[in-house]
């Protein structure tokens, strides 16, 4: 078991290690509050929307960014998605992701977003978000959608959207390393809106604070990893034994999704952001099902019976007029 897995288990179980780390967690929270109080970011030349979270690990943020990009495009914006580019090795910074880039060059999540979004949105990478946004603006895009960045205080965004998901959206309520939070729970008040799944909405009482909008992640179909033109219906999973391969932060959710679709999964977990190679999956029993985030890293050596579970995020309808009203000051 890795150190991260050990810590995550401790956070969930309230183990002795997590308890012993609480003084460090309290220090993390104090530093985060100090940064929010004293770091004054500057606005970009075009409106910017940050989509982020309070904790480490998956929260459904990437499919939400894709859904918001579609929604904003329909509303008439030219949307550029901006990412820090964690783990990416592009030839230069900032860098505009190309659909045929390798995962090593572009990073798995930015490449996934670039391939899903087609030609109407672009994806830009740079640790300095201001430089990435400036590059997007120079290319004619008039709205930047930041995949993560709630804690990136050098930027003063137009809107901050905070994603909360799962029955324990705030974990054990403690900051790193005593818990999964990057900031204290009251940092939610710095958001302009909360995007919550049903489980998170039930777990966090509704009080005075930012408006809430529900979302859900819906499986759509199965797509062949080595040929996106081939697909299968979800009904084909009923009663089928499959090998579930994943290298994401919360793999149990993926397994639960497959079980909910009637499959009988045999899980094979890899670390989050794992760089897959052919030998990782070559001898696993088929059929094999993986997440879209993992599939972009396996396309070159995937076999005919390797499949991606394609998902989409759906936001409640009331989020659209709220977004349009919030962005009115930037309409030209």
Swiss-Prot record:
It is an enzyme of class 2 (transferase). ATP binds at residues 55-62. GO terms for molecular function: ATP binding; tetraacyldisaccharide 4'-kinase activity. Pfam families: LpxK. InterPro entries: LpxK, P-loop_NTPase. Keywords: ATP-binding, Kinase, Lipid A biosynthesis, Lipid biosynthesis, Lipid metabolism, Nucleotide-binding, Transferase. GO terms for cellular component: plasma membrane. Its EC number is 2.7.1.130. It catalyses: a lipid A disaccharide + ATP = a lipid IVA + ADP + H(+). Pathway: Glycolipid biosynthesis; lipid IV(A) biosynthesis; lipid IV(A) from (3R)-3-hydroxytetradecanoyl-[acyl-carrier-protein] and UDP-N-acetyl-alpha-D-glucosamine: step 6/6. One of its GO terms (biological process) is lipopolysaccharide core region biosynthetic process. NCBIfam families: lpxK. Transfers the gamma-phosphate of ATP to the 4'-position of a tetraacyldisaccharide 1-phosphate intermediate (termed DS-1-P) to form tetraacyldisaccharide 1,4'-bis-phosphate (lipid IVA). Belongs to the LpxK family. This is Tetraacyldisaccharide 4'-kinase.
